[in-house]
Design a protein with these regions (language model features):
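Low-complexity, intrinsically disordered terminal/linker segments enriched in charged
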Residues: 69-72, 101-104, 108, 114-119, ...
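Surface-exposed, charged secondary-structure patches
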Residues: 22, 60-116
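Short, well-ordered alpha-helical segments enriched in acidic and aromatic residues
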Residues: 42-71
């Protein structure tokens, strides 16, 4: 069921609407789909390839392979959305887009955890006029998930 839901998300992102650009050309739509696919019953380490840059996807898959090989935690021992091991997102997530160039920018996600305001940032990239993809998760405290995963 989870795979079917994830495939539906990818299909909706990539399917062009009549006379409109595909939803994947809206960075906030991609960020929301990534968040929804990697929380709840989703899996951060197995996002749909369409939602993440090749480099970030490779890093996430590497962490999954390490966890399976080691039969436990490898590099990531916390929930990047919570910037901690425990807690819950208490408010609806608000998204905002900050463009840096035609092929790079950042989606800011605002929400509350433990009654504190959190801002998680998703650097976004795209090739030419293609689809936007998540390239990293910058936690509320500023930790880069991609840099953490690059550590030996």
């Amino acid at each position: 069921m989870r795979k079917t839901g994830m495939l539906m998300i990818a299909g909706l992102l990539l399917a062009p609407a009549a006379q409109a650009a595909p939803a994947c050309q809206e960075p906030v739509v991609v960020a929301r789909a990534f968040y929804e696919a990697t929380t709840g019953d989703g899996d951060l380490l197995e996002p749909l390839p369409a939602l993440v840059s090749p480099a970030f996807g490779k890093a996430l898959r590497g962490e999954r392979a390490c966890q399976q090989r080691e039969e436990g935690i490898c590099t990531i021992d916390f929930d990047p959305w919570l910037d901690a091991q425990d807690g819950d997102i208490e408010t609806p997530v608000r998204y905002s887009w900050k463009e840096a160039s035609a092929t790079a920018g950042q989606v800011e996600m605002h929400y509350s955890v433990w009654k504190k305001a959190y801002v998680t940032r998703l650097p976004m990239v795209r090739q030419g006029q293609g689809c936007w993809q998540v390239d990293d998760i910058l936690t509320n405290s500023g930790r880069s998930v991609r840099k953490i995963l690059a550590q030996p």
